[in-house]
């Protein structure tokens, strides 16, 4: 009997298990595990008086910091730590303690259940409701049993760290959307260039491509689509069909496959032939410089974290390289799909390799004739863009200079007005000081006059009292004198009548009384003179009271002058602020002017380098004439000839077999 080998690839299929019971048992076990973990953590919190669930976000934060340091560098990790610390401090200061603990615990348990494989379903929602109910009904009010000061920073971290991660997620989402938009724009441009390339092909190849498209559409309409068909964003391509294709298409497919692997490693979309390596090295340098300038423009518009900036640079560089090299690679729809990332099956790959080995190398010459001019045509675009940028920068420079001149004129006018205002302020200050001195002297004189008036009024009252008292005494003396005279007359008459004695004593008494009367009259005259002087002083004081009204007028004038000086000081401070703003604007304009000049110098240097490299490439490029004797297709006329190349003073040999750069 013959010995038979078993086919290891055809293994016996295992028996089908009941997935319904498996899912039920697995989900119930999973949710029971969640409940057990939750109960254990709550028990540990109650026993040890610490919220252990707050340590889980802290552990996530440490892991994210380690990952950012490992994959994105120290600068981004430090920035991430600073942002998270700031968010934690804000939550710690501005959120009340009870609401902080409630939100932190609720978020931790909801996020823990959310990380399961089930997603949003009835058990997860029920667990969320249970957690929220327990936190709101029981633990929201019982904060006395815990170390509040120790748990509060961790609770703030449980809220601040998710806010930071949500912010970074939103930023990455926005950058992803912008990147998709850019990819769509590049895809449209590639399709446009693909159509141009298809229209530039000879009519025979166009007919072959039309037949291939019809066959592809027919293959798409079949119901039995195999798993070997790969879907791409530009269209699906069947990988298992066997059609008679020409040699250029097969070569483009093979080159697209080989270069697609390199593009995944280096993020470059350039697929060149092995024959064009010395020529394409210079072309790649020019395209790299153009892509570097375009990536700078995109980086100015899309400001973000370092990770997203690097991703956007690589994405824009790959898309621009793909667009510039589309003339070399994308000459058929199959090569276009291969460069965009679709990979054919192994059977079609072996078939294409066998066909490629059997064909002649004449098709490489045709490809060179079709590829080189399209790359050469894209070279002046960089110079045109750089010249446009230089014109824009020169216009900005002139505008900034005009603004600088206007600002300088405004500063000079403001400085002159400031000098005038300062002189006026000095005069007003001197006048104000004089008025204040006068006012001070007037106030002092007024106080002294008030004191003198009060003293004189007291003296006047005393003099009036003394006068009234003296008048009373005088009246009494007159009455007494009259009585004495009457009694004396009676006594004289009686003495004359009765006796002629005691005449001398009476005469002496009369003399004394007359002397006293004279003294009293003299005192009366003195008192009257004093009363007249006091009345004159009272009149003078009344006149002074009338003069006080003039001092009030001076006070009102002084207050008006003070208001005016305050207004002038405010206007002077406002003008100084405007002057400072103008100086800051002048500094900004100078800085922008220096930046623009630096950019102009950089652009001039780049233009010189590009012109030098283009001259070297054109000097190295010989005139291409190839014979197509063995090719069944008609030769394609080249789109570029070395006769149209401008003569440059380069010292390179255009007829050299291998390009060798000059040694300096």
From Swiss-Prot:
Region Disordered, residue ranges: 253-274, 320-375, 630-664
Subcellular location: Nucleus membrane; Cell projection, Axon; Rough endoplasmic reticulum membrane
Bias type Basic and acidic residues, positions: 253-265
GO molecular function: microtubule binding
Disulfide bonds: none
Compositionally biased tracts (Polar residues): 320-348
Organism domain of life: Eukaryota
Residues forming coiled coils: none
Residue numbers of Phosphoserine PTMs: 305, 332, 631, 634
Membrane-spanning segments: 28-48, 75-95, 120-140, 154-174
GO terms of biological process kind: brain development; chemotaxis; neuronal signal transduction
GO cellular component term of the entry, any: nucleus
Glycosylation, residue list: 324, 340, 452, 655
Sorted UniProt keywords: Cell projection, Endoplasmic reticulum, Glycoprotein, Membrane, Nucleus, Phosphoprotein, Transmembrane, Transmembrane helix
Membrane topology (UniProt): Multi-pass membrane protein
Annotated family: Belongs to the macoilin family.
Role this protein plays: Plays a role in the regulation of neuronal activity.
Name the UniProt record assigns to this protein: Macoilin
UniProt source species: Homo sapiens (Human)
